[in-house]
Curated annotation (Swiss-Prot):
Pfam families xref list: RNA_pol_Rpb6 (PF01192)
Protein name: DNA-directed RNA polymerase subunit omega
Gene Ontology cellular component terms for the protein in this record: DNA-directed RNA polymerase complex
GO MF terms held by the record: DNA binding; DNA-directed RNA polymerase activity
InterPro entries: DNA-dir_RNA_pol_omega, Pol_omega/Rpo6/RPB6, RPB6/omega-like_sf
Keyword Endoplasmic reticulum attached: no
Catalytic function, reaction form: RNA(n) + a ribonucleoside 5'-triphosphate = RNA(n+1) + diphosphate
Gene: rpoZ
Source organism (scientific name): Psychrobacter sp. (strain PRwf-1)
EC number of this enzyme: 2.7.7.6
SUPFAM superfamilies the record matches: RPB6/omega subunit-like
Amino acid sequence: MARVTVEDCLHAVDNRFELVLVASKRAHQLAKGVSEPLVEVNNDKPTVLALREIAAGLVTKDILNQPDHHFATNSLDLALSGGQGF
């Protein structure tokens, strides 16, 4: 897919504002390595991957009901956070 538009994604998420929340949460998961991409990467950035996953129907607004993960998983993150997570 050469370009992803908002209209490509609106069949999976009803409104544009919710789409922003879904895409940003999924992009954050991808950027932090919480989960693997569900589409071919093609050298795309996490935000583009998130939108492509939404457009393909692989990610829905149900992602908003998932608990946020604390990303202090490596020793540097733990040291910087004082061992308490973020």
